[in-house]
Amino acid sequence: MGRKIVIVGAGAVGGYAGAHMVQAGEDVTFIDPWPEHVEHMRKQGLRVTHAMDVAEFSVPVRALHVTDAQLLSKEKPADIAFVCMKSYDTAWATTLIQQYLAPDGYVVSLQNCMNEETIAGIVGWGKTLGCIASSITVNLPAPGHIHRGAGKGGAAHTVFRAGEVHGRITPRAEEICRLVGYADSAKVTGNLWGERWSKLVANAMGNGLSACTGLTGGEMLQNEPIRRFAIRLGSEAIRVGQAHGYQLEEILHLPPETIALAGEGDEDAMRVCDDQRFRDSKRTASGQRPSMGQDMQKGRRTEIEFLNGLVVREGEKVGLTCRANAALTDIVKRVERNELRPDPRHISELRLN
């Protein structure tokens, strides 16, 4: 206790983790760019609900709009800053909080995608840590309200994985594990980059598909052409990660090689993937929509270039062509530009070599 924590981005993941920290008595300040959300948090706090098994709670919180961040200059410097913004906002969010860090303070990327390098380019590698939130299924349905489309992961699934970029287990990584552990199961990892790429594979298999089809996670699972295309997306991303030397972890409760083989035409592996994904669907509300699908619905910019687009670019570096990821990236960008409307046929009628 006594550590000053700042969370830049009080959206679904930042709000969820931060609300639990506040509930546990930690000193947390939220900074967010959405005025209505900040105002609601100031007046009524944060409300956290779950689709199953967990009681609702509300906590009073301290929230600042980004334009009021300068108030931090009159206070004790921040010991820990969590950046929980969309990937395309990482640079400015890190720059914003950098000047308010304590000399031994550090920044934690609690985001999707691979943003540690961007953060390190601003504050230095020595002040950069990462934390993955795996299968957390949270969203922000209204100002001041965080909803999780499932229960807690608990012993069945470790949700948070905190680690140093160099892979050593340190007191800092253990401290982050303790803080996010208020929200759900957590562990310290010595394999941050492998964990990061594994989470990126999982996101690449669902986020962009939801964005361009307009379907929820449950609806995509019931659509065989889309379900198979998701496996191909994952297969390409896994091969890229392996080529870069990442030690991949389990992805969607499946061995990476099983997904990779399924995407390359192994029907036995495909049946294993289908069986596991249908089992997993019973633990999540059927109407849960992946975050990029939510962004598309709200008319917001997507992270497609930081997910499937990144897979394509990293594949090119090691001589791998990722046709499925390239096609999806193009379709999502066209939907973003309103050249196309979200439609499952964008995928079901797609023909690739």
Identify the function of each model-found stretch:
Residues S58-H147:
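Rossmann-like NAD(P)(H) cofactor-binding subdomain of soluble oxidoreductases
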Residues G2, I231-N353:
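NAD(P)-dependent Rossmann-like dehydrogenase/reductase catalytic/cofactor-binding core
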Residues D32, M52, H65-T67, Q111, ...:
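Residues at the C-termini of beta-strands that transition into short coil/loop
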Residues M1-V54:
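NAD(P)+-binding Rossmann beta1-loop-alpha1 motif at the extreme N-terminus of oxidoreductases
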Residues Y100, I122-W125, P143-T258:
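Internal alpha-helical scaffold of NAD(P)-dependent oxidoreductase catalytic cores
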Residues R3-K4, D79, T158:
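Nucleotide donor/acceptor-binding cores
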